């Protein structure tokens, strides 16, 4: 009897142990399955998160690239417009400078021609005046010389009946005539002093050429007024 009871208890204990082992195995399988499911979900979640992160980064990169491209295009366009404006301004400035230089050159040419014309006119007038004075002086000298020769001739003829004292007086008179001719030439060219002009041409303010002749039986005088 005791053996049967022991066997029954041993079987019951073994059955309980098997049942517990089966339950433990089932629990372990459930936990393993649950862990596998969680791992799968975690992996899927991580994969989804990585995909979303990559897509977001891709979108941001694309947006950044587009913004940079747009900015570069705007910068290039702005630089192009500024370069064009600068070139136009420089061209306009160069044109204005060239035009101003042309106008100044033209004005300088006009002034040079005007100065040349004035100088030519002045030289022409001066040359004509000198020529006239020289002609007047030559004419006066010629007339004076002719008068002196005539006077000398007449004096020589009259000297035949005169004394030596009269001949001496005649020689002095000829000397004075020669000096008068020299003073007249100086006066003609404006080289005479104011005192000489007053002495030889009293009351005269302009240069005039004239020859007068006074004749008396014993004396002849030639004077330039």
Curated annotation (Swiss-Prot):
Its main location: cytoplasm. LEA 11-mer repeat repeats lie at residues 53-63, 75-85, 97-107. Residues 1-167, 193-225 are annotated as: Disordered. It comes from the Eukaryota. The keyword Cell cycle does not apply. One of its GO terms (cellular component) is cytosol. Residues 205-225 have a biased composition (Low complexity). Keywords: Cytoplasm, Repeat, Stress response. Residues 28-39, 49-61, 71-83, 93-119, 154-163 have a biased composition (Basic and acidic residues). Residues 141-153 have a biased composition (Polar residues). It is found in: Cytoplasm, Cytosol. Coiled coil: none annotated. Belongs to the LEA type 4 family. Involved dehydration tolerance. This is Late embryogenesis abundant protein 29. It comes from Arabidopsis thaliana.
